Amino acid sequence: MEKDSDTHASLYQESLAMHRRLEGVLEVASKVRLRTIHDLSVAYTPGVAEPCRKISENQGLVYLYTLKKNTVAVVTDGSAVLGLGNIGPYAALPVMEGKAIIFKEFAGIDAFPICLDTQDTEEVIKAVKHLAPVFGGINLEDISAPRCFEIEARLREELDLPVIHDDQHGTAIVVFAGLLNALKIVKKELGELKIVISGLGAAGVAIFRFLVRAGADPAKILTCDSKGLVYEGREEGMNHIKEEIAKLTNPEKIKGGLKEAFPWADLFIGVSVGGIVTEDMVRSMAKDSIVMAMANPVPEIMPDAAKRAGARIVATGRSDFPNQLNNCLSFPGLFKGALGTCARRITPEMEMAAAYALANVVTVGELSEDHIIPDPLEKHVVPAVAKAVANASFESCAARKNLEDSV
């Protein structure tokens, strides 16, 4: 662990120096050169009046004459940033810049960091709606639960463009993609799995919903938060989201914590806090168990300990271990596919298509216990995911088929 701490300390200092040297990691680049007065007249006044007139006559043409089609807003209120917590909009800006450069480097998408100086749900929704004319999609980021669920749901309902809270759906897509490949190795069926999910924030809730939509049996799922196992009738630490989950899961109303949840489990998914899973817990799982311990920077259990205790496949959220389950595997391709069809929304079918496409990037020959998910830098990831998402966009009627007629 001391070596691990030294490595992180070195990365922190290197990152700090880079941000100071560059004064941020993002800039705006021009697509045109202004060498003459004529150039200026075409790019700006008076020439720019003509695309303005066209868009005024048909709002859908904004996708043809402006940056909107390939532009995403990365929006946060700074209330739940990485493992740092509620650090506010100013301190959240480096993370949003980092997200924006991933969009650009991986998918060629222009993304702008938007850090809102409010954590009032209604004000966040109102601000994003007012900004929407500029963007082809909205990526909500690092907004605390349960507020994030309402903010995303309302914006999806009220805006005519793709809105996704990446901490929810990006995570769920990557987890399910990894699980699809893990199940090929352990030769188990999704509907038969006994599953334990630790953490019921944005990621945990979205993973639960995604698994059930994909075919997992909710009656075979146990969920656990900081207050222990969730069950119908529990009073402490509940909210309306957890109450919905409680009605579907844990039919025996098992009480206690993770220790009581682990026996005979086939799959553990952790999106909670580091070091809370013991080797004895993993040892009590079913044969050929799968452990996805994604707390950062310290997983719920370290991979070597999980393997030592009998886990067949182990994944984490870290790049220095095999099987890194990282959102950057999903959101660039997801948005590229959605923006490419000028989609009005991101549908469940598009998310599911993204997960299957991501899983299939790993070929049969490459698949192994230490390789269930592609490397984030693998060049085939974004094109594969984007193509699948674009196809699903048309199939689920989310795409704008004719921009000349769209409003």
Where are these regions (language model features)?
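Glycine-rich phosphate/diphosphate-binding loop of Rossmann-like nucleotide-binding domains
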Residues: 82, 89-107, 159, 165, ...
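A short, aliphatic-rich alpha-helical micro-motif
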Residues: 132, 190, 261-262, 282-285
